[in-house]
């Protein structure tokens, strides 16, 4: 059975942002490998954060018409977890137990609800295991 992996927003940003070449290359490598060897997920939260960061907060902002094309690519390549009321409640539980920010807890809750075993993130604690199910990995280390 293939692993299920979840991508945090920063991995998706680096996938399309070429201003940090080393991280861009590594994000592409992990992304391509995951498409071949795993079932991959993001959430609607990741999509919306990507739009804001890629269009406004990176060194060379990506035009919205290109972001739209990138999103179409992601939609055909990945499974999209839709955040609902239960996901928000799960995020509160994760925050209370593990002390992540609420937004990181929402990413974790989405990954757990998608039955993922790996969460790729640059920002969260590398190697931590959540609920004995989900391991956080930093693909840039």
What are these regions (language model features)?
Residues 1-42, 57-65:
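Short, well-structured N-terminal submotif of metal-dependent ribonuclease cores
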Residues 2, 108-141:
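Acidic, PIN/NYN-like endoribonuclease modules and their adjacent C-terminal/linker elements
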Residues 11, 46, 87, 107, ...:
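Alpha-helix capping/helix-boundary segments
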Residues 36-37, 76-77, 115:
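Structured helix-beta-strand junction loops
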Residues 41, 81, 137:
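General small-molecule cofactor/ligand-binding pocket signal
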Residues 58-78:
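Helix-adjacent hinge/juxtasegments
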Residues 79-119:
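Active-site neighborhoods of divalent-metal-dependent phosphate/nucleic-acid chemistry enzymes
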């Amino acid at each position: 059975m293939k692993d299920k992996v979840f991508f945090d927003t920063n991995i998706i940003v680096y996938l399309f942002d070429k201003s940090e070449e080393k991280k861009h290359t590594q994000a592409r490598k992990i992304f391509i490998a995951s498409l071949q060897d795993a079932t991959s997920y993001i959430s609607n939260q990741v999509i919306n954060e990507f739009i804001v960061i890629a269009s406004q907060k990176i060194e060379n902002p990506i035009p919205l018409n290109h972001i739209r094309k990138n999103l179409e690519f992601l939609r055909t390549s990945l499974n999209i977890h839709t955040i609902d009321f239960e996901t928000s409640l799960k995020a509160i539980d994760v925050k209370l137990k593990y002390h992540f920010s609420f937004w990181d807890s929402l990413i974790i809750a989405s990954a757990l609800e998608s039955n993922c075993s790996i969460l790729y993130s640059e920002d969260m604690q590398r190697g931590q295991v959540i609920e004995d199910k989900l391991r956080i990995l930093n693909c840039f280390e």
